[in-house]
Amino acid sequence: MLSRILFFLLICSHISYSQFKNLQNFDERDLRFGYYIGINQYDNKVIYKNNTPYPISVDRAEGINVGLIGELKLNKNLFLSLEPGLHANKKNIIFNERKEFTNYGDTLWVVKSNNIHIPLLLKYSAKRLDNFRPYLKAGLSTSINLNEIEGTLSNNGLENFKFEKFNFYYELAFGVDFYLRYFKFSPSVRGVFSLKNEIPNNTPDNPWTRNIDKFLTRAIFINFSFY
């Protein structure tokens, strides 16, 4: 997958290399719109109350991002970007405390999520060089999980635990604007880090979560934007 992405970017670089500037007046617009498609990979950072020889592990898989972009020009280098979208993902959370669980089904939790993800980001763009313009983005975001995320593991008989439906993040991204003949193409790589504990109400009699102090989401997005 990564090799295909790099090959695609090399093709875009070759196409956008020219002695003439494409879309010369594009950055003069105060407001521009676009859309993005991409892939994501979600992970979790678990902070424990006590050290454990059996940490929780996450089996990650790639998901899909799609969304819209609204970008407001603040000055020649700064832009404010609103990027609401739908992110779909699936991952397996594996509880490795074998002493507590006798059935394999009690240790594996398959989590499917569909998130409405809404970032508000500040974009700093470097000086344009021919048909290239690198940029950095940073900001905050929130997400709403459309799935009912409950800790329903293989008839455990205990009170189910729930993940938070709403989450908050900070985001950092790097990308390059390619000015092509008819549109601007903008690939980027983004790191997303949650600010909120996703399992806040642990009970001491729940073997799945009682040793968890904080359960935080981390993610990597590779987005391809078109304006």
Language-model features: where?
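Short, flexible, glycine/charge-rich loop motifs used to bind or transfer phosphoryl groups or to couple energy/partner
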Residues: 22-24, 125-127, 210-211
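Sec-dependent N-terminal signal peptides
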Residues: 4-13
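Extracellular/periplasm-exposed beta-strand and loop segments of Gram-negative cell-envelope proteins
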Residues: 42-61, 89-115, 143-167, 197-221
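Hydrophobic, lipid-facing positions within transmembrane beta-strands of outer-membrane proteins
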Residues: 31-33, 62-68, 116-120, 134, ...
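Gram-negative (and chloroplast) outer-membrane scaffold detector with strong preference
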Residues: 27-31, 39-45, 71-149, 223-227
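A generic local structural motif
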Residues: 19-22, 123, 172
